[in-house]
Amino acid sequence: KIYAAMQNYEPSVTINGFVETDIPKLMSAINLDNPHLFFVDFHYELQSDLFSQTVILKYIYNKADTVILTEKVKKVCNKILSKVTGKTEFEKELSLHDILARNVLYDDVAKDNLLKFHARSNTILGVLFYKTAVCEGIAKTFKFLLNALDIKCIVVKCKATDDLSGNEKFERFGNT
């Protein structure tokens, strides 16, 4: 229900059957599993009563801008994906990894100010348009590209042990 509301640019969505503490986990799962929702600001507001929670949704871009950005995303992705045509599934994964590793820089500026740079560095837009992102943006882009090739995977959020900064990785599912 929340995912559908986001896709339709609804300002809010009321859900039943969830406790308030489950909403952040649900929102995080939607965020990490749907990199194409780059236009959603996952810093939401929550209104609760005894029987339901209303999630007040926020958007980074309006519908018109999202349509334009989505077309640009498709063009860039098609260019990248054309480089892995004819390869095995494993070769595609490795090639995409190498393409991202060679062409994307870690965004140290955004790392120190994630709220200010979130729309760019934590989404696929940072990688595809600016060639810079933090771990989350890079992992989401890798997932986005793999999913476009019908290779199933997920983004897993974890904490590094040395500095407790958030890091993302992806887990794939398949035969190879």
What residues fall within each predicted segment?
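N-terminal accessory/pre-domain segments preceding catalytic cores
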Residues: 1-90, 94, 98, 102-105, ...
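Residue-level signal for alpha-helical context at structural boundaries
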Residues: 44, 114-115, 164
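Surface-exposed patches in mature extracellular/periplasmic domains of secreted proteins
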Residues: 86-89, 93, 107-117, 154-158
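Loop/turn elements at helix/coil->beta-strand transitions in domains of secreted/extracellular proteins
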Residues: 89-94, 102, 122, 147-154
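Generic hydrophobic secondary-structure packing signal
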Residues: 92, 131, 173-174
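Short, conserved helix/loop micro-motifs enriched in His/Cys and acidic residues
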Residues: 103-134
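Hydrophobic/aromatic-rich core segments of domains that either
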Residues: 137-176
